[in-house]
C-alpha cells in the first residue's frame, strides 16, 4: 500500500488533541504520542505532501507542550476557553486498523482469484484481533464473522468437516512443553521466515528436525511424518486457520543468559519470588530507596520524651569531652578499660562551662619559640606527671587551659610527650570538665553575683517543656500587633434589612457594625471659639458720651457769644475722641469676623456669633447717638452765628 492510498487525520482543536491526548497529559505521554505520530507522518517515512504538513503541526504541538513556560500559558488559555475537558475525536487504536490513516483503496479492490482471497484474509487477520470462543459459543449462519482467518472464505456449497474445525482450534490451546531434545533449540527470525516461505507444511519440517537430531527412530519418524502430512493436507484442503497462524508468528525475544541461568535453578517452595532474579531486583530497589532516607544527624531517631532528649544531649557532650581529652593528653592502648569505667561512672551528669577568653593576640615567631622552650624545661624538670587532679595550666599571655577530674588517666608514653612538647596549643574556646563533688562545692562557694551562668543537666530537665503538655496559643496574639491579618469584609452574621427612614430622622437606633444602605451619622467633633477671639471689649458700657453744651445766650452780648463758641469747640473735641475709640473697637470686630469665618457658622459657635452681633449693634448705637449730639450742637451754633451775621454785629466786630 503506497503513501498516496492513505488519508491522514488530525484533530486540530487543541494541541493536546493534535497528539491524540487529553488535557493534563504528562511529559512521558506527550513524548510517546509524538514519537508514534512522527513514525507515520515524518517526510522520511511518508511520501505524501499532506503528511509533511501534518508533521509540522505535530512538531509545533510537541514543542509547546514540552516547554514548561509555554505549556503553562497554553493551559491557562484552555482553562479560559473551557477546552480543558476536550477529548480528541480521532478513534483510538482498537477501532482503527492502520494507525492515523484510513485504507481507502481496500474498499475499492475486488479479488478474483484464490491468491487475492488469501491476501485479503491475511490483511483482515492482522488488523482485527482473533476471536477465541469455545465450541458451544461458536455462531452459525450466513454473514457471521467467526474470526477464523481464511475459514470465512469457504464456499457455501462446501460441507462442514468436524475434524478440520477441531484442528483449527488447536492454536487456542496452550503450547505443549518442549521435549528434552528440543531444549537447546532457539527459534529465530530466520527459521520463521523459512517456515513462512517454504511450501512444505509445518509438521513435515518438524519431522526433518527430529530426524537430523537423531533422537527418534527413523521408522517412527517416517510414520509420524506421513501421518502429519495427511493431516496437513486435510487441513489445507478444508481451509483451516492453522497455516495463517504460522505466517503471523513474530520474532521471539532473545532471552538473557543471566536470567536464564537463574531460571534453570530450582525455586524454593517457601520463597515468594518466582526466580532469584526477581528477588535480587526487589532487594536492590529497596536498598536504593532507603539509601537517600538515611539520617545524618547524631540523633538517629526522634525522641519520644524529654528523658530521651536529655540522654542524647549527655551523649553529645560526653563525646565532645572525650575528643578534647584525647587532643590534650592523648590516649594509650592500655588505658581502654580505665576509660570505659570512667565513661560509665560519669555518663550520668556533667557540668560544662564555656570559659570566655579575652581578645586573641597574634604571637610572633620569637614568642612561640620561647613558649616551646618553657614547656620543654617544665616537662624535663617534672618527669613524674601522674597527678592530673590539680590543674594543667599553660600561662601564655592570652592562653589558659583548665582541666580537672583526670586522676584515672595513667602516665602517657614518652613518645607522645615529645610530640606534645613540639605543639603550641592555640585554643579559642575551652570546656572545663568538673566532677560531681567539685560541682557541688563550687556551687556552694560561688555567689549569684559572680556573673557566671551555670546550668546542670538536672535543672535543664526541669526547665525543658514536656512534650505531652500542649502549647498555649491564647497569648500568641499579644506579640502580633503589627502583623496585618486579612479580615472578612462581610460579617458572617445574617444581614438585617434596614428600615427606610426619612432624611430628618435620627440614626441613633442603627448599629454601626452592620452594613446599611443609608448614610451613617458623622462622628462630630466640637471646636468652640472662646469669647476673647471675637475681640469683644466689655468695657464699652463704661464709655460715657459728652454732654451737649447750652448755647442760649444774648447775641448782643459779645462775651456770651465767645463763651458759647468755646463750649462748642470743647464738645467737638470730646466727641471726636469717643468716636475714634468706638470706630477702633468696631474695626477689630470686623477683622475678628474675617479670621473666624470658617468656624463661625458651626453649631457650637452660633450663639457666640449672635452675642458678637449684639455687641456690634451696641457699638453702633453709641456711635450714632454721639453723631446725633454732634449734629444738634453744630446746628445750634450755626443758628447763633447766622443771627449775629444778620444783625450786623459780626461785621462790626
Swiss-Prot record:
GO cellular component, one term: nucleus
Compositional bias per record (Low complexity), positions renumbered to this chain: 213-241
Cellular compartment(s): Cytoplasm; Nucleus
Composition-biased stretches (Polar residues): 161-171, 187-200, 298-308
Main location: cytoplasm
J domain span: 14-78
InterPro entries: Diphthamide-biosynth_chaperone, DnaJ_domain, J_dom_sf
Region (Disordered): 85-308, 490-512
CDD domains, sorted: DnaJ
Keywords, ordered alphabetically: Chaperone, Cytoplasm, Nucleus
Name of the protein this chain belongs to: J protein JJJ2
Species in which this protein is naturally found: Kluyveromyces lactis (strain ATCC 8585 / CBS 2359 / DSM 70799 / NBRC 1267 / NRRL Y-1140 / WM37)
Gene: JJJ2
Amino acid at each position: 500500500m503506497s503513501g498516496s492510498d492513505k488519508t491522514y487525520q488530525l484533530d486540530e482543536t487543541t494541541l493536546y488533541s493534535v497528539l491524540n491526548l487529553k488535557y493534563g497529559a504528562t511529559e512521558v505521554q506527550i513524548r510517546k504520542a509524538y514519537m508514534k505520530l512522527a513514525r507515520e507522518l515524518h517526510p522520511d517515512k511518508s511520501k505524501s505532501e499532506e503528511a509533511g504538513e501534518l508533521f509540522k503541526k505535530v512538531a509545533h504541538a510537541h514543542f509547546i507542550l514540552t516547554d514548561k513556560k509555554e505549556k503553562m500559558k497554553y493551559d491557562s488559555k484552555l482553562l479560559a476557553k473551557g477546552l480543558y475537558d476536550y477529548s480528541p475525536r480521532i478513534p483510538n487504536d482498537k477501532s482503527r486498523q492502520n494507525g492515523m490513516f484510513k485504507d481507502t483503496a481496500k474498499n475499492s479492490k475486488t479479488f478474483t482469484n484464490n491468491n487475492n482471497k488469501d491476501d485479503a484474509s491475511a490483511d483482515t487477520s492482522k488488523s482485527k484481533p482473533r476471536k477465541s470462543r469455545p465450541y458451544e459459543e461458536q455462531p452459525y449462519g450466513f454473514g457471521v464473522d467467526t474470526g477464523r482467518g481464511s475459514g470465512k472464505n469457504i464456499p457455501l456449497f462446501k460441507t462442514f468437516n468436524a475434524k478440520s474445525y477441531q484442528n483449527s482450534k488447536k492454536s487456542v490451546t496452550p503450547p505443549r512443553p518442549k521435549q528434552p531434545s528440543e531444549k537447546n533449540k532457539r527459534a529465530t527470525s530466520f527459521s520463521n521466515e523459512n517456515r513462512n516461505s517454504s511450501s512444505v507444511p509445518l509438521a513435515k519440517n518438524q519431522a526433518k528436525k527430529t530426524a537430523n537430531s537423531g533422537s527418534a527412530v527413523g521408522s517412527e519418524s517416517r510414520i509420524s511424518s506421513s501421518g502429519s502430512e495427511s493431516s496437513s493436507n486435510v487441513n489445507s484442503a478444508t481451509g483451516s486457520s492453522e497455516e495463517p497462524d504460522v505466517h503471523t508468528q513474530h520474532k521471539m525475544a532473545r532471552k538473557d543468559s543471566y536470567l536464564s541461568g537463574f531460571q534453570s535453578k530450582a525455586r524454593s517452595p517457601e520463597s515468594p519470588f518466582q526466580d532469584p532474579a526477581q528477588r535480587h531486583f526487589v532487594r536492590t530497589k529497596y536498598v536504593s530507596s532507603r539509601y537517600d532516607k538515611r539520617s545524618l544527624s547524631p540523633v538517629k531517631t526522634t525522641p519520644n520524651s524529654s528523658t530521651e532528649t536529655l540522654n542524647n544531649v549527655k551523649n553529645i557532650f560526653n563525646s565532645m569531652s572525650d575528643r578534647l581529652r584525647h587532643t590534650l593528653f592523648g590516649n594509650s592502648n592500655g588505658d581502654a578499660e580505665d576509660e570505659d569505667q570512667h565513661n560509665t561512672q560519669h555518663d550520668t551528669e556533667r557540668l560544662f562551662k564555656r570559659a570566655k577568653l579575652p581578645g586573641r593576640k597574634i604571637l610572633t615567631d620569637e614568642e612561640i619559640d620561647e613558649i616551646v622552650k618553657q614547656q620543654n624545661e617544665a616537662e624535663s624538670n617534672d618527669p613524674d606527671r601522674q597527678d592530673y587532679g590539680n590543674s594543667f595550666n599553660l600561662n601564655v599571655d592570652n592562653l589558659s587551659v583548665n582541666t580537672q577530674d583526670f586522676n584515672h588517666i595513667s602516665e602517657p608514653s614518652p613518645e607522645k610527650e615529645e610530640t606534645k612538647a613540639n605543639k603550641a596549643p592555640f585554643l579559642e574556646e575551652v570546656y572545663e570538665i568538673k566532677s560531681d563533688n567539685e560541682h557541688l562545692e563550687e556551687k556552694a562557694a560561688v555567689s549569684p553575683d559572680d556573673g557566671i551562668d551555670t546550668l546542670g543537666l538536672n535543672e535543664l530537665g526541669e526547665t525543658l517543656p514536656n512534650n505531652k503538655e500542649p502549647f498555649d496559643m491564647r497569648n500568641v496574639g499579644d506579640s502580633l500587633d503589627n502583623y496585618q491579618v486579612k479580615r472578612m469584609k462581610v460579617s458572617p452574621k445574617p444581614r438585617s434589612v434596614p428600615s427606610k427612614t426619612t432624611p430628618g430622622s435620627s440614626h441613633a437606633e442603627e448599629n454601626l457594625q452592620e452594613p446599611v444602605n443609608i448614610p451613617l451619622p458623622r462622628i462630630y467633633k466640637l471646636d468652640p471659639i472662646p469669647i476673647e477671639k471675637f475681640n469683644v471689649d466689655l468695657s464699652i458700657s463704661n464709655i460715657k458720651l459728652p454732654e451737649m453744651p447750652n448755647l442760649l445766650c444774648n447775641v448782643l452780648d459779645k462775651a456770651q457769644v465767645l463763651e458759647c463758641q468755646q463750649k462748642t469747640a470743647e464738645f467737638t473735641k470730646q466727641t471726636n475722641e469717643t468716636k475714634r475709640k468706638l470706630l477702633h473697637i468696631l474695626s477689630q470686630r470686623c477683622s475678628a469676623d474675617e479670621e473666624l469665618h470658617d468656624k463661625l457658622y458651626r453649631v457650637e459657635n452660633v450663639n457666640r456669633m449672635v452675642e458678637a452681633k449684639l455687641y456690634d449693634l451696641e457699638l453702633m448705637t453709641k456711635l450714632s447717638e454721639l453723631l446725633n449730639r454732634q449734629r444738634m450742637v453744630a446746628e445750634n451754633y450755626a443758628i447763633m452765628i447766622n443771627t449775629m451775621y444778620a444783625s450786623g454785629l459780626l461785621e462790626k466786630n
